[in-house]
């Protein structure tokens, strides 16, 4: 259940409203007038809660739940108690999330810390910076020379935007974010501690020591990207580092210089992607994946958590392990090792 101390619903919805907004089919119209004012898990549901069940293995928890309505698939309908409105859909979690964004808009687009959307007199702003209307810059933020910021963007307290950077419309730049040598699109969200556009790890060694290679590229972040807390993205050496439209990157991820990440990718926490690697559209990396430099990962690829990718991966494949290889091969090798261990144990 949402904690109303932090997240207050912006409105109330009836079950009929929810069905209309999502296109879900309401099986018991007598519940149309019932009010929904919060989201919950099945276990923590209270009066007014909306829940969802997407897999049959979780459906037993419906019994005894206090939720007023549930999104579910056709195969789960028979498990829903008579006390609950049934909203049938092929995408329960997606529809649940849609209603959540309507009920709690502040949870997906953070609001100013001080409650007022204005340019604070206590921000440090270079006189050449340019802002569109409805920009909010909070106290303690630093905005460098020739920066341009689009309409409706929020720059939080202690964020630092370096000279010549461009930030689009309706973006959220959280506290302690630093941005330099970067072009950022619309509706981008950078969470606390994110560092964008710093030097890449480029050096050349020799008998006289280690010399730095100038990093002369940029970071391009396309529309709709979200980047989690304390993630770092290095600018390119000569090319750009690019994060494609709609991609979502978790906390504590390192993306090196010249990396190209496609559209609508998902990258979980603690991944490390080495320089000049490219990742195709709609690919997914589990937590803790490491990718070597100059690797080409195709479109719609899935990589299991803690894998080490050292070879190119074709479109649509699922890989895992270290070094990573196709799932079937990985599982066979794991099974073989287990059977060898059993044989050795029996012989001893």
Swiss-Prot record:
Swiss-Prot/TrEMBL catalytic activity: a UDP-3-O-[(3R)-3-hydroxyacyl]-alpha-D-glucosamine + a (3R)-hydroxyacyl-[ACP] = a UDP-2-N,3-O-bis[(3R)-3-hydroxyacyl]-alpha-D-glucosamine + holo-[ACP] + H(+)
Source domain of life is Bacteria
This entry carries the following GO cellular component terms, namely: membrane
- State its Enzyme Commission number(s): 2.3.1.191
Catalytic site positions? 257
An example GO biological process term is: lipid A biosynthetic process
* Assembly and interaction partners: Homotrimer.
Q: Spell out the NCBIfam families in the cross-references.
A: lipid_A_lpxD, PRK00892.1
Protein name from the UniProt record: UDP-3-O-acylglucosamine N-acyltransferase
Q: Which gene encodes it?
A: lpxD
């Amino acid at each position: 259940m949402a904690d109303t101390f932090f997240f207050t619903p912006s409105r109330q919805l009836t079950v009929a409203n929810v069905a209309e907004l999502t296109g879900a089919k309401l099986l018991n119209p007598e519940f149309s007038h019932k009010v929904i004012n919060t989201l919950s898990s099945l276990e923590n549901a209270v009066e007014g809660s909306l829940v969802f069940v997407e897999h049959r293995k979780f459906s037993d928890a419906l019994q005894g739940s206090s939720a007023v309505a549930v999104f579910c698939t056709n195969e789960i309908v028979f498990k829903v108690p008579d006390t609950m409105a049934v909203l049938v859909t092929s995408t329960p979690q997606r529809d649940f999330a849609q209603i959540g964004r309507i009920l709690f808009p502040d949870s997906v687009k953070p609001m100013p810390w001080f409650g007022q959307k204005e340019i604070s007199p206590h921000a440090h702003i270079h006189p050449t910076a340019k802002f569109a209307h409805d920009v909010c810059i909070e106290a303690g933020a630093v905005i460098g020379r020739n920066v341009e910021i689009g309409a409706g963007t929020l720059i939080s307290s202690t964020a630092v935007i370096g000279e010549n950077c461009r930030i689009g419309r309706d973006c959220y730049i959280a506290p302690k974010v630093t941005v330099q040598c970067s072009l950022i699109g619309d509706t981008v969200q950078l969470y606390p501690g994110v560092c964008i556009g710093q030097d890449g790890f480029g050096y050349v060694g020799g008998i006289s020591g280690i010399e730095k290679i100038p990093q002369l590229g940029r970071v391009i972040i396309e529309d709709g990207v979200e980047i989690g807390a304390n993630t770092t993205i290095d600018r390119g050496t000569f090319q750009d580092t690019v994060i494609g439209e709609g991609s979502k990157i978790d906390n504590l991820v390192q993306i090196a210089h010249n990396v190209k990440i496609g559209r609508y990718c998902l990258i979980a926490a603690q991944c490390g992607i080495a320089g000049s690697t490219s990742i195709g559209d709609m690919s997914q990396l589990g937590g803790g994946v490491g990718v070597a430099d100059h690797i080409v990962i195709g479109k719609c690829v899935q990589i299991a958590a803690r894998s080490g990718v050292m070879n190119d991966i074709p479109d649509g494949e699922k890989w895992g392990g270290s070094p990573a290889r196709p799932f079937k091969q990985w599982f066979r090798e794991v099974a073989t090792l287990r059977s060898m261990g059993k044989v050795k144990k029996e012989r001893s």
